[in-house]
Structures are given as C-alpha cells and as structure tokens.
Amino acid sequence: TLLFSACGMTANTVSSPVEPTVKSNEKTAVNNKALVYFSKDISPVSLIKLYDKINQDIHGKVAIKIHTGEKNGPNILPREIVMALQQHVPDSNLVETNTFYKGDRYTTAGHRETLKVNGWDFCTVAIMDEEGAVMLPVKGGNHFQEMSIAKNMLNYDSMLVLTHFKGHTM
C-alpha cells in the first residue's frame, strides 16, 4: 500500500489514485489531524497523483528525503517511482542523512558509494549532515527550546519525505 500524508484543511481518502475521490468531510483544522491518502497502486502515476493533491504548500528548492538502503539491500523504495516523482517536482533533488550506526552509510564517502550501487545516481543526492549539524530554536516548544538538525537542511525551502516501514530494530 502506498501511503501519502500531509497537513491540510480537510481529511480526504484517495480510493483510486488515477481519479482521486474525496471520502470524508472531517476538518483537520479543528481536530489538528494530518491528511492521509492510501493507494494500493504502487506506481509512478499513483505517487504523482497523490503528490499533486498535497503540493500546495511545497515551494522553492525542494528536498525529497528518502531512505536509500544498505548496499544491495532488499528494503529500498522502488527507484522508478522516486525518479518519476523527482522529475515531476520542480527544483528538487533527493536528500539523505548518514546513519548513526556503523555500516555502509556511516560516512559520507561510504554513503555515496552505496548510492551508486543501489541506483540512486539519476539526480543529485545531497547528504544533509555532510557538513555537520546546526541548532535551531523551537518556537513555543513545550519540551525543547532548540533542536539539532542536519546543516544542509538550511539549503531547502520545502521537504517531501518518502519512507517505508522497516519493522526492524536499530
């Protein structure tokens, strides 16, 4: 199942990704809930249709955050749908972060090699923490007054996150 989520004013369900249908009239502004779209069609056309439903607040330079997987790993998003989406989103490129655990993606050099092996070389892939981290203030934060983020995140105006459910521990 392809799941797409975004914050917005209404909660809609896509029953058919080719011709999306609104199934709910619940107001997310009142309930502070995110929109969640589902599709059983995992294809470039489906992902682009879902993106087109939520892209009204995505602007400027766009980071498309993906999980690129370990070398030759089985848990990799289908590259053809990511490639189609990236080509559809103006002024976008893929972004990723190095892993906290030791492995193929622990260093930027190792990560770049893994990107090539796994076929993520069809566009620029920025390693967000390649130049370290930066502390940003959290306005009105209840638990944190500042947070550490990957420094290269400051180079983007919007971020679209594509992920998969892994079901494994770190």
Where are the regions that the model predicts?
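N-terminal and secondary-structure boundary signal
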Residues: 7-170
